């Protein structure tokens, strides 16, 4: 009986123990499931955004799809500015600083040498950005060097594709074309003025990668917007001629600088625009800042004798003078100021006034016409008004806003003092004269159709003055050295004193020659400006006229323009022997 009771008790105790263990295990499982459920709820609901963000940070990548900057080309399609693919050498400091014995590693030494960055300086830069995952070590590295660096397989060093501008014509078109900064943004010249047109919009795509860098999902794509190429009106063959001859002229005359502009009369297109001294836009680290400026649109000067044809055209139109009129050109006084010429002439014809560049003669003609008519003629030719060529930095010039004009004001205005123009405005003036009085907008962009214009003066009067201007490059004229063998050229030379920083005239000069060729059927207008010639001669007829002749001779030959005056060849040969 006792054994039965004992067995029953032990059996009951065993069952209770098993039940207790069962319930304990059950409770543990239930508690675990409860905790897991809470954790799932926490992860899926409460902390889901953080987890998604963390996962995306590890797997999502946004890749830029570069849009190559548009090319700048000349009218024939020759490249003036192109984009070449290069690489940026980048570093991830967070990875590099985990690497041991970096400074003693030969591959790091090789990187230092190929980038010309001292190893100590490189690691000072890396250490100063310890928490960064991206810094630049070098930019715009050519593909050969980039490939070498890639083969070094340095931890934390990687390549980033980027672009660089290259300018094939270097100094020849530097001030006009300009350049971009290291990020491809135009900061000078055409590059700056047409930056929006040349710049496309980069695209981007969002992808998901696995831990080995393989693309496992393409999430989104924003297509890049293509950039535009730009075809300028410039002809690089003519631009090269103009630049080389201008450079030589600046050197011979010992001028501070020189500017030359060539215009296609029929279309108003700028075929060449050159400055000297220049710079190499492919190496902007070593440029002289004053040489960057495009003086054709930024610099102002008093046009001097180059405006005298305007006065003659207006006087002929008003009937104040006739083609065969004779003018008394003896010196005279206005308000205690003497008006005189460089060389004395008692009387001159209208042609003689232009040929000898008589200040006295043109002053007397200007004084005989209504003031408003004189001013209006200058305004019609665009003096003191921007050309609206589209180039950033173009100056307006200066036309005096006087309500009352004294006789002295009128006299000095007639020979180009008291107003300021840019070289481009002067080029437009002579382009208008060459078009027989048609005021046509200039263009730096290639045009496929003839540009319309406005007839601002009757052609018959303008043609008469062009014929008179031919005498300037003939024996007895101040611009004899501007003559071109075999061609009739209509020119006007000039010399003006420069204004100093205190607003007074100083003993420095601007010499210029502006002209048209061939005079029988004008095709081109050309202006040459030399700033502060410091040689023995400084007059326009002596320093800028030869540059005009050299350039125009080569231009007419290059463009296969038929000679229209074979009779002047002997005259030029004799003149050259005398000089």
From Swiss-Prot:
Its main location: membrane. One of its GO terms (molecular function) is peptidoglycan glycosyltransferase activity. Keywords: Carboxypeptidase, Cell cycle, Cell division, Cell inner membrane, Cell membrane, Cell shape, Cell wall biogenesis/degradation, Hydrolase, Membrane, Peptidoglycan synthesis, Protease, Septation, Transmembrane, Transmembrane helix. One of its GO terms (cellular component) is plasma membrane. The active site is at residue 305. The keyword ATP-binding does not apply. It comes from the Bacteria. It is found in: Cell inner membrane. The keyword Glycoprotein does not apply. Pfam families: PBP_dimer (PF03717), Transpeptidase (PF00905). It is a single-pass membrane protein. Pathway: Cell wall biogenesis; peptidoglycan biosynthesis. GO terms for biological process: cell wall organization; division septum assembly; FtsZ-dependent cytokinesis; peptidoglycan biosynthetic process; proteolysis; regulation of cell shape. It is an enzyme of class 3 (hydrolase). SUPFAM superfamilies: beta-lactamase/transpeptidase-like, Penicillin binding protein dimerisation domain. Its EC number is 3.4.16.4. Catalyzes cross-linking of the peptidoglycan cell wall at the division septum. This is Peptidoglycan D,D-transpeptidase FtsI. It comes from Buchnera aphidicola subsp. Acyrthosiphon pisum (strain APS) (Acyrthosiphon pisum symbiotic bacterium). The lineage of its organism: Bacteria, Pseudomonadati, Pseudomonadota, Gammaproteobacteria, Enterobacterales.
